[in-house]
Amino acid sequence: MPIAIKNSKIDITSEKRTKELAKKFTKYLKGGEFVFLYGEMGVGKTTFVKYLINEYQKINNLTQTEITSPTFSLLNEYQVKDIRIKHYDLFRINSKEDINNLDIFEKDNKLITLIEWPHLIVDKQDIKFITLTFNYLNQLNDRTVDIKV
């Protein structure tokens, strides 16, 4: 992962900066990764995912589709050429058993798994994961994301 992203705190106050970060992130994710997205409601997790998936569509000459939060469906899935992207939102999940029933930890080198609200996931062994923690600063005016690889 480029040094500008790995284990760093990045300003994403504007949507433009969020989009730029998502674009950089696509150069790192090749398949087989799990990305955990932490942060309060409305801080930019789904916006980041939208720009990330749209960038994959763009670089593969595909029509950019509307990317929405899977808060109610729990999962939205996208096929981008030979890469599948699963976008989970676990906000409404209340137990570890419910997480186990979702079969989130499918291991596939052609799959990128993005998980919002991963707080109940405790058994992270045997998976390669990246943590993005989105934060508000200055009474919600500014935002940052901390990236841990």
Predicted regions and their residues:
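Post-Walker A helix-loop "phosphate-sensing" segment adjacent to the P-loop in P-loop NTPases
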Residues: 54-66, 80
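Hydrophobic anchor at the beta1->P-loop junction of P-loop NTPases
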Residues: 35-37
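N-terminal pre-Walker A segment at the start of P-loop NTPase domains
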Residues: 2-24
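P-loop (Walker A) phosphate-binding loop of NTP-binding proteins
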Residues: 40
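Short phosphate-coordinating micro-motif centered on Lys-Gly-acidic
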Residues: 95-99, 105-149
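Conserved lysine of the Walker
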Residues: 45
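Conserved nucleotide-sensing/catalytic segment adjacent to the nucleotide-binding pocket
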Residues: 68-71, 75-116
